[in-house]
Every structure is written in structure tokens, then in C-alpha cells.
From Swiss-Prot:
Belongs to the UPF0291 family. The lineage of its organism: Bacteria, Bacillati, Bacillota, Bacilli, Lactobacillales. NCBIfam families: PRK02539.1 (NF002711). This is UPF0291 protein SPH_1589. Signal peptide: none annotated. It is found in: Cytoplasm. Gene3D superfamilies: Helix hairpin bin (1.10.287.540). It comes from the Bacteria. It comes from Streptococcus pneumoniae (strain Hungary19A-6). PANTHER family: UPF0291 PROTEIN CBO2609/CLC_2481, UPF0291 PROTEIN YNZC.
Amino acid sequence: MDPKKIARINELAKKKKTEGLTPEEKVEQAKLREEYIEGYRRAVRHHIEGIKIVDEKGNDVTPEKLRQVQREKGLHGRSLDDPNS
């Protein structure tokens, strides 16, 4: 997210605590927060999709649901053509 938008979120939060927000500012704050949260969720999802879990012996123990997502995206050498990947 653009640093200016994050600064605006913080500015609105401070103003809300000190003097309150106008109805327009409340709408702006809600939109900015939603945009921030969506970006955060997208980043976490991307990070989790890139994880490969292995046990002490080096065996892949990644949950099947995550493996399927990785197959669809071609991550970690997983392929839709190879269900064992």
C-alpha cells in the first residue's frame, strides 16, 4: 500500500481520538482501512501459498489443500499433471 495512504489512515485515527471525524472522513477511513486489510490478506495468502512443510526425515507433509493450490499455481515443482507432487 502507498505510504501516503498509510499516513492518511494514521492521521484520521489520531483525529478521530482528538476531535472526531466528519461523515466524509469516516467513509474515507473505512475505505482506506478496507484497502489496507485486503492488501495484508493478499500478502499473507501469498506467503502461505509459498510454504512447503517437511518433517525431520525430509518428507513433504504439506497439507493436501495447500498442495492443490500450489499445483494450480505451479509452485514448488508441483504440477496438475502429477497428483503425487
